[in-house]
Amino acid sequence: MTSLLVHTYPSLVKGILIKRYKRFFADIQLDNGELITAHCANTGPMTDVCVEGQPVYLSRSDNPKRKLAYTWEMIQLGETWVGVNTNLPNQVVKNALLQGVFPDLVKNETEVRSEVAYGQNNGSRIDFLLTHGDNSLTYIEVKNTTWNQGETALFPDTVTTRGQKHLQELMALLPAAEAIMLYFINRGDCYRFAPGDSKDTKYGQLLRQAVAKGVKVLPCRFQVTPTGIYYLGLAELQL
Protein backbone atom coordinates (compact mmCIF):
# COMPACT_ATOMS: atom_id res chain seq x y z
CA MET A 1 0.00 0.00 0.00
CA THR A 2 1.01 3.63 -0.38
CA SER A 3 2.46 5.12 2.80
CA LEU A 4 0.13 7.52 4.60
CA LEU A 5 1.34 10.45 6.68
CA VAL A 6 -0.26 10.09 10.13
CA HIS A 7 1.89 12.43 12.24
CA THR A 8 3.96 15.53 11.54
CA TYR A 9 6.78 16.46 13.88
CA PRO A 10 7.57 20.04 14.85
CA SER A 11 11.05 21.24 14.00
CA LEU A 12 13.40 18.77 15.71
CA VAL A 13 16.91 19.17 17.11
CA LYS A 14 19.63 16.68 16.16
CA GLY A 15 22.27 15.23 18.47
CA ILE A 16 24.16 12.13 19.58
CA LEU A 17 23.11 9.82 22.42
CA ILE A 18 25.72 9.88 25.18
CA LYS A 19 23.87 7.74 27.72
CA ARG A 20 20.45 6.91 29.11
CA TYR A 21 20.02 6.47 32.86
CA LYS A 22 17.39 6.18 35.62
CA ARG A 23 14.90 5.26 32.87
CA PHE A 24 13.66 8.82 32.35
CA PHE A 25 16.87 10.65 31.44
CA ALA A 26 19.11 10.73 28.37
CA ASP A 27 22.25 12.81 27.99
CA ILE A 28 22.55 14.14 24.45
CA GLN A 29 25.28 16.12 22.74
CA LEU A 30 23.63 18.50 20.30
CA ASP A 31 25.14 19.21 16.91
CA ASN A 32 26.27 22.61 18.20
CA GLY A 33 28.34 20.87 20.89
CA GLU A 34 26.01 21.64 23.80
CA LEU A 35 25.43 18.78 26.26
CA ILE A 36 21.82 18.56 27.47
CA THR A 37 19.61 16.14 29.39
CA ALA A 38 16.41 15.09 27.63
CA HIS A 39 13.29 13.34 28.92
CA CYS A 40 12.99 9.68 27.90
CA ALA A 41 9.31 8.70 27.80
CA ASN A 42 10.08 5.00 27.29
CA THR A 43 10.58 3.49 30.75
CA GLY A 44 11.24 -0.04 29.45
CA PRO A 45 14.63 -1.63 28.74
CA MET A 46 14.62 -0.45 25.08
CA THR A 47 16.35 -3.70 24.11
CA ASP A 48 18.87 -3.24 21.25
CA VAL A 49 17.53 0.29 20.66
CA CYS A 50 19.33 2.39 23.27
CA VAL A 51 22.72 2.44 21.52
CA GLU A 52 25.17 5.07 22.72
CA GLY A 53 26.89 7.14 20.05
CA GLN A 54 23.97 6.96 17.61
CA PRO A 55 22.24 9.99 16.05
CA VAL A 56 19.00 11.09 17.71
CA TYR A 57 16.34 13.74 17.24
CA LEU A 58 14.72 15.73 20.04
CA SER A 59 11.66 17.94 20.30
CA ARG A 60 11.82 21.10 22.40
CA SER A 61 9.03 22.45 24.60
CA ASP A 62 8.68 26.13 25.47
CA ASN A 63 6.63 25.28 28.57
CA PRO A 64 8.46 27.02 31.46
CA LYS A 65 6.98 24.53 33.97
CA ARG A 66 8.83 21.59 32.44
CA LYS A 67 12.01 20.54 34.21
CA LEU A 68 13.46 19.18 30.96
CA ALA A 69 12.81 21.19 27.81
CA TYR A 70 13.83 18.42 25.43
CA THR A 71 12.10 15.10 24.70
CA TRP A 72 13.92 12.25 22.98
CA GLU A 73 11.87 11.35 19.89
CA MET A 74 13.90 8.89 17.80
CA ILE A 75 17.25 7.19 17.28
CA GLN A 76 18.97 6.10 14.08
CA LEU A 77 20.06 2.46 13.88
CA GLY A 78 21.76 1.72 10.57
CA GLU A 79 19.55 3.34 7.95
CA THR A 80 16.41 3.14 10.10
CA TRP A 81 14.93 5.73 12.42
CA VAL A 82 13.24 4.14 15.45
CA GLY A 83 10.62 6.05 17.44
CA VAL A 84 11.28 6.05 21.20
CA ASN A 85 8.69 8.54 22.47
CA THR A 86 6.06 6.17 23.90
CA ASN A 87 3.62 9.04 24.37
CA LEU A 88 3.13 9.24 20.60
CA PRO A 89 1.68 5.86 19.47
CA ASN A 90 -1.74 6.33 21.06
CA GLN A 91 -1.97 9.86 19.69
CA VAL A 92 -1.01 8.63 16.22
CA VAL A 93 -3.47 5.72 16.34
CA LYS A 94 -6.31 8.01 17.42
CA ASN A 95 -5.59 10.42 14.58
CA ALA A 96 -5.43 7.48 12.17
CA LEU A 97 -8.79 6.18 13.40
CA LEU A 98 -10.40 9.60 12.99
CA GLN A 99 -8.83 10.04 9.53
CA GLY A 100 -10.24 6.72 8.31
CA VAL A 101 -6.86 5.03 7.93
CA PHE A 102 -8.43 1.84 9.31
CA PRO A 103 -11.72 1.68 7.35
CA ASP A 104 -12.56 -1.81 8.64
CA LEU A 105 -12.55 -0.47 12.21
CA VAL A 106 -14.21 2.91 11.87
CA LYS A 107 -17.47 2.66 9.98
CA ASN A 108 -20.20 5.23 9.53
CA GLU A 109 -21.28 6.87 12.78
CA THR A 110 -18.48 5.33 14.82
CA GLU A 111 -17.64 7.12 18.07
CA VAL A 112 -13.99 6.91 19.17
CA ARG A 113 -13.25 7.26 22.89
CA SER A 114 -9.91 7.02 24.69
CA GLU A 115 -8.94 5.62 28.09
CA VAL A 116 -12.33 4.09 28.89
CA ALA A 117 -12.75 2.08 32.09
CA TYR A 118 -13.47 -1.63 31.60
CA GLY A 119 -12.64 -5.05 33.00
CA GLN A 120 -13.37 -6.43 36.45
CA ASN A 121 -14.91 -3.66 38.58
CA ASN A 122 -13.86 -1.24 35.82
CA GLY A 123 -10.35 -1.55 37.21
CA SER A 124 -8.57 -1.17 33.87
CA ARG A 125 -8.62 1.32 31.02
CA ILE A 126 -8.73 0.38 27.36
CA ASP A 127 -6.76 2.59 24.99
CA PHE A 128 -9.68 2.97 22.57
CA LEU A 129 -13.35 2.02 22.63
CA LEU A 130 -15.23 2.28 19.35
CA THR A 131 -19.01 2.43 19.48
CA HIS A 132 -20.53 1.77 16.07
CA GLY A 133 -23.85 2.88 14.65
CA ASP A 134 -25.41 -0.51 15.38
CA ASN A 135 -24.25 -0.20 19.04
CA SER A 136 -21.63 -2.92 18.59
CA LEU A 137 -18.35 -2.31 20.43
CA THR A 138 -14.68 -2.65 19.48
CA TYR A 139 -12.00 -2.51 22.17
CA ILE A 140 -8.44 -1.69 21.06
CA GLU A 141 -5.29 -2.04 23.16
CA VAL A 142 -2.09 -0.48 21.72
CA LYS A 143 1.45 -1.71 22.38
CA ASN A 144 4.55 0.16 21.24
CA THR A 145 7.05 -2.17 19.55
CA THR A 146 10.70 -1.31 18.83
CA TRP A 147 12.65 -4.54 19.46
CA ASN A 148 13.56 -6.51 16.35
CA GLN A 149 15.48 -9.51 15.12
CA GLY A 150 16.24 -8.89 11.47
CA GLU A 151 13.02 -7.96 9.71
CA THR A 152 10.81 -9.31 12.51
CA ALA A 153 9.39 -7.00 15.18
CA LEU A 154 8.99 -8.59 18.60
CA PHE A 155 6.92 -7.77 21.68
CA PRO A 156 7.54 -7.70 24.57
CA ASP A 157 11.25 -7.03 25.14
CA THR A 158 10.96 -7.85 28.85
CA VAL A 159 8.55 -9.65 31.18
CA THR A 160 5.30 -7.68 31.28
CA THR A 161 2.68 -8.80 33.79
CA ARG A 162 0.66 -5.75 32.76
CA GLY A 163 0.71 -6.89 29.15
CA GLN A 164 -0.33 -10.40 30.19
CA LYS A 165 -3.27 -8.91 32.08
CA HIS A 166 -4.34 -6.91 29.04
CA LEU A 167 -4.50 -10.06 26.91
CA GLN A 168 -6.60 -11.82 29.54
CA GLU A 169 -8.95 -8.85 29.74
CA LEU A 170 -9.35 -8.73 25.96
CA MET A 171 -10.27 -12.42 25.93
CA ALA A 172 -12.87 -11.78 28.63
CA LEU A 173 -14.64 -9.29 26.33
CA LEU A 174 -15.46 -12.02 23.81
CA PRO A 175 -17.91 -12.76 22.28
CA ALA A 176 -19.98 -9.77 23.39
CA ALA A 177 -17.58 -7.31 21.73
CA GLU A 178 -14.75 -7.21 19.22
CA ALA A 179 -11.31 -7.18 20.87
CA ILE A 180 -8.16 -6.01 19.09
CA MET A 181 -4.50 -5.96 20.08
CA LEU A 182 -2.71 -3.38 17.95
CA TYR A 183 1.08 -3.50 17.87
CA PHE A 184 2.57 -0.16 16.85
CA ILE A 185 5.79 -1.18 15.07
CA ASN A 186 7.74 2.03 15.56
CA ARG A 187 10.30 1.42 12.79
CA GLY A 188 9.99 0.88 9.07
CA ASP A 189 12.39 -2.04 8.58
CA CYS A 190 10.20 -4.84 9.97
CA TYR A 191 7.86 -6.82 7.74
CA ARG A 192 6.85 -9.52 10.21
CA PHE A 193 5.68 -9.57 13.82
CA ALA A 194 6.06 -12.31 16.44
CA PRO A 195 5.73 -12.55 20.22
CA GLY A 196 8.99 -12.05 22.11
CA ASP A 197 8.99 -15.54 23.61
CA SER A 198 12.62 -15.39 24.72
CA LYS A 199 11.80 -12.44 26.99
CA ASP A 200 8.32 -13.42 28.22
CA THR A 201 7.20 -16.97 27.49
CA LYS A 202 3.85 -16.54 29.25
CA TYR A 203 2.98 -13.49 27.16
CA GLY A 204 3.57 -15.47 23.98
CA GLN A 205 1.38 -18.30 25.26
CA LEU A 206 -1.41 -15.87 26.16
CA LEU A 207 -1.20 -14.12 22.79
CA ARG A 208 -1.61 -17.42 20.93
CA GLN A 209 -4.48 -18.34 23.23
CA ALA A 210 -6.11 -14.96 22.62
CA VAL A 211 -5.88 -15.34 18.84
CA ALA A 212 -7.37 -18.84 19.06
CA LYS A 213 -10.29 -17.44 21.05
CA GLY A 214 -10.97 -14.65 18.57
CA VAL A 215 -8.93 -11.63 19.62
CA LYS A 216 -7.75 -9.87 16.47
CA VAL A 217 -4.10 -8.86 16.16
CA LEU A 218 -3.10 -5.87 14.04
CA PRO A 219 0.71 -5.58 13.71
CA CYS A 220 0.85 -2.10 12.17
CA ARG A 221 4.01 -0.97 10.39
CA PHE A 222 5.09 2.65 10.71
CA GLN A 223 8.03 4.45 9.13
CA VAL A 224 9.59 7.07 11.37
CA THR A 225 11.37 10.03 9.77
CA PRO A 226 12.68 13.34 11.17
CA THR A 227 9.68 15.09 9.62
CA GLY A 228 6.83 12.67 10.28
CA ILE A 229 5.44 9.17 10.80
CA TYR A 230 3.93 7.16 7.93
CA TYR A 231 1.60 4.16 8.09
CA LEU A 232 2.87 1.35 5.87
CA GLY A 233 0.19 -1.30 6.36
CA LEU A 234 0.16 -4.56 8.29
CA ALA A 235 3.13 -6.80 9.01
CA GLU A 236 2.84 -10.57 8.62
CA LEU A 237 1.78 -12.18 11.90
CA GLN A 238 3.95 -15.14 12.86
CA LEU A 239 2.69 -17.20 15.78
UniProtKB/Swiss-Prot annotation:
InterPro entries, per the entry: SfsA (IPR005224), SfsA_C (IPR040452), SfsA_N (IPR041465)
Taxonomy, superkingdom: Bacteria
MF-aspect GO terms: DNA binding
Pfam families referenced in this protein's UniProt entry, alphabetically: SfsA (PF03749), SfsA_N (PF17746)
Entry's family note: Belongs to the SfsA family.
PANTHER family: SUGAR FERMENTATION STIMULATION PROTEIN A
Protein name (Swiss-Prot/TrEMBL): Sugar fermentation stimulation protein homolog
